[in-house]
Structure formats: structure tokens, C-alpha cells
Amino acid sequence: MNKPHRVLLALVLLAPKLAQADSQWVLEQSTLTYHVSHPLHQIDGVSHAARGKGVCHAGQCDFLIAVPVKSFDSGDSNRDLHMLQVTRGAQFPLVSVRTRLPETASASATIHADLEIEFAGQTAQYKQVAFQVVMQGNQIRISGIIPATLSDFKIDPPSLLAIPTKNEMPVRVEMTWRPQ
């Protein structure tokens, strides 16, 4: 085999290795809590079912997090069923969140992330959402609040006794990530 063929063979064999990510992260544990307010009561729906992965390459990390809509539990099965109907959960069963962060972000006590959230068949952008970052050994714990609203996703506010809920639907995020 002559030298050009050896170089070509080496490039073909090494190219997949060179294209791989520098590092990867996996979501180990999560608690996502949405809050809806009505003049007669307050509602919190909690999910621990989020899955996520982060892939870092060339100093940037791309994260994707997904959670089934039906995994949120408010403590009232009738309310949860109505939430699935209002959010079109049968047609759009997942909430997904995408963000890109610099690989050095984990060294900060606070990060500001631009989020793209798909929910109920709609996509909303949230700029510079603050999250607190705590390193625990090789794990990174993040927490913060996404300032979501029902109107961001074209969801009509549910009503009780002809009184609609407030438009605000903040989502509290608590996640633990570890290197893969």
C-alpha cells in the first residue's frame, strides 16, 4: 500500500473519532414543578420523569431535556386529566427544552441560559433565564425558575366557576447532571 492510500485509510478510520463529542452529560435526577394560581386555590404539578443529555464539543454544550406531559402530578387525578386535555397532551405528549451553554458555564455560581421550549404544539423562547449551579463531587446541581405563561403556548386558561386561572405558569427546575 503506497503512502497516499495509507493516509486516506487512516483518515477514514480516524474521522469518526475526531468528530465525537469532547464530553457528554446525562440528567441523573430531576424535579420539575409548575405552579398555576386561581383565586380559589393554588396548584402545583410535579414530575420526576425528565430525561436529558448534554453533548459538549469545541467549547459549547448542547442540552436536550424532555418530560412526558402526563408525568406531572398535582395530587388530583381529575385536575391532571383536565390539564392533559387543555395542553393537548395526547397530541403533543412531551415537553422538550433545548439550550446551548459554554462548556465553562459549570464553573459559575449562576448561569444565564437561553431556552427553547416546545409544549402543547408551540415553541417559546426564554432569554437569559437564571439558574444557580452547585458542584457536588462530579455532579452538577442546577436550580431556577422558568417564567412560563399559558399564553406563550397558546393555552386558554382553565376556569373554575367561570373564573380563569392566572396566565403565569412558572416552572421550578431542580436537576442533577453527571458526566457520562
Which residue stretches match the model-derived regions?
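Low-complexity, acidic/polar, glycine-enriched regions of mature
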Residues: 21-180
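N-terminal signal peptide c-region/cleavage motif recognized by signal peptidases
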Residues: 15-18
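Bacterial N-terminal signal peptides that target proteins for export
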Residues: 1-8
